[in-house]
Amino acid sequence: MNKEKEIESFRSFEHVWIDMPDGVRLAARIWLPSNALTKPAPAVFEYIPYRKVDMVRARDERNHPYLAENGIVAVRVDMRGSGDSEGLMSDMYCEEEIDDARQVIKWLTCQPWCNGKIGMFGISWGGTASLQANVNAPDALKAIIAVCATHDRYEDDIHHMGGCLLTDSVEWGATLPAILGAPPSANIEENWFEIWKARLDKLSFPLETWLRNEDRGSYWRHGSVIHQSDEMRAPILCVGGWSDRYSNSVMSLVDRRPDLAWGIVGPWGHHYPDHAHPGPGVGFQKLMLEWWQHWLIKDNPLELEWPKLRTWVRSYDSPADAINIRSGSWVQTPASKEITFMTKWHLSKGGLNKDASEIHLNLPSNLKAGTKGADTGYFGRFGGLPPDQSNDDRASLCFDTKPLEKDCLIYGAARLELSLKSSDHRNQLCLRLNDVAPDGTSVRITWAIRNLALDDNLETPDQPFPLGDLKIRVQFPSMAYRIKAGHILRLAVSQSYWPMVWVPPSIGVITLLRGVLTLPEPHYELESLKVNLPKVEDLPLEKSYTVSTEAQLERYPEKFENGEIRSGWYQPYSSVYFNEIDTYFGYETCAEFRIRPNETLTACCCYEHSMTFIRPDGTAVVTCMVQLKCNNDKYLLLGTFKASWDNQIVKTHKWNLNITRKYT
């Protein structure tokens, strides 16, 4: 261990090596309770590729010292090929990554300061890695916490939805190489620069693989615990936010494993809940401490006396780019499937009603729906919430209820069954559920998308579906939403959702024949929390960092230029200074979308992500730009990468790829 810092209740070690069986060493930062060498303690670790030395250092300072102050060893590990760790990362969630997590568990149990009881937690990638480690988990892994994690990499991750390609995947394709291409710190070796150059020489470009795997095949099944939920061993605390699509795993896992999983879903986006946007937030540190104290401190822990589900039931808010506090309230329930019944609404020419009927209505043939989607379908960035849906609704075929006579509470995953005719196998449907206020303002509750080339399991059918009548089933993401009396529930259906979803090769003719929307509603009025969730604390009390800027996302106004419709957004430069290591870390991202009206093969999206590291020994800048275009049968992918040190270029990469496009 090196660079030790000691305060009254714990010691921290800036850089520790963890040996893997193949000789690669993973880098860790450790916070050790002061008495752990004389009284071994349980250990909890977070395992991610996001650079322990700087990138998420401020976040780590909120969580890990708090655990050590309360008698639990806290460990932050950089994944293989990232940060200060050795080795290479070829892709997300590869077998090597999962094996390494198990080796970290084994290493922790062998340390003199550990009593053999291990917990694992994380957000996003770290939460998903925790779920994966829990499949046939080693006995030492006693519990996990998965925040904003996915249990279904194909349907509920950043890449695809309903068998359609999300442009979020392209953004992540520009971001990940920048993260992996950033330099290790001088903590590791005197020859860190040579190690960096060797890593840059073999830098991976995983977006190519993501585009090549269009359906739910073995590639996306790997690491998706939804297919292995019966094999999970340790108790799971699932945490999500309704402004973040990764929340879908919470209700699903509690439904699948009510014996093993507990869930909390609030109104926030892709954040730990103590930094909630929108709020209200939750004191995550106290929450996880209570979880770890039950499963790791008690000798023979019995069933945890928590409600199975604690959810923020949203209600109407006037749409805005950013909302500080959502309208709604906390409730506690058993697993959602245990307390709900299904209410059916049939699609008719008069809207949504209780009687089945034939409709025979064509969907609008345009690319106008989607411009009011939000900056992204997933992260719920501060400043990027979906605006008023009225413009998108006018470009869609809408089915409305009459103004509701009483509140309607949707609790769980709604479903839609449709009979339709389509002129092309590769058409797509976008489906939105909206809350329409008496003044006509339309708020998106949730949405789903469906690629008609794939079957209901989002697999490639043995033979293409006939172009006659087609029956499909679509499940919406889970939700907890109260539509107030006097408001209208709207189902809006369109053929595209650009720029959030990549457009099909052509806009064909889709005729809806019949349809039924099924909503899960509780049997009874849901119970308010008996015990309030912990309040947010401003941690750590003494900060070793200063956030210089944390700007709100800026949307580019849509404009028509040179025959194209152009839109986009910009995440302004945000930076933080870490005084302990005398380092500035900053980043910025921009996105641009272009398309000619009703010409699907002119679609183009471009993302650029840049990161800056200003250290005592020099300044590194890494930038990755990705552009995606298409023709009928190919994705045309262009990527560029540049890394520099003190204004001198260290390495560049250029990728120019044509990727077969069969189904999306």
Please state what every model-predicted region is.
Residues P278-A643, Q648-T664:
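C-terminal, loop-rich substrate-recognition/catalytic regions characterized by aromatic stacking residues
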Residues G122-Q132:
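Glycine-rich nucleophile elbow surrounding the catalytic serine of serine-hydrolase chemistry
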Residues M232, C238-G240:
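Short beta-strand/loop motif that positions the catalytic acidic residue
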Residues P112-S124:
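Alpha/beta-hydrolase fold nucleophile elbow
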Residues R245-V250:
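Conserved alpha/beta-hydrolase "acid-adjacent" motif
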Residues N2-A36, D400, L404-K406:
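N-terminal cap/lid segment of alpha/beta-hydrolase-fold proteins
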Residues D60-E61, E69, Q132-E231:
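Accessory cap/linker subdomain of secreted extracellular hydrolases
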Residues N35-C110, I158-H159, A437-P438, W498:
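Cap/lid segment of the alpha/beta-hydrolase catalytic domain
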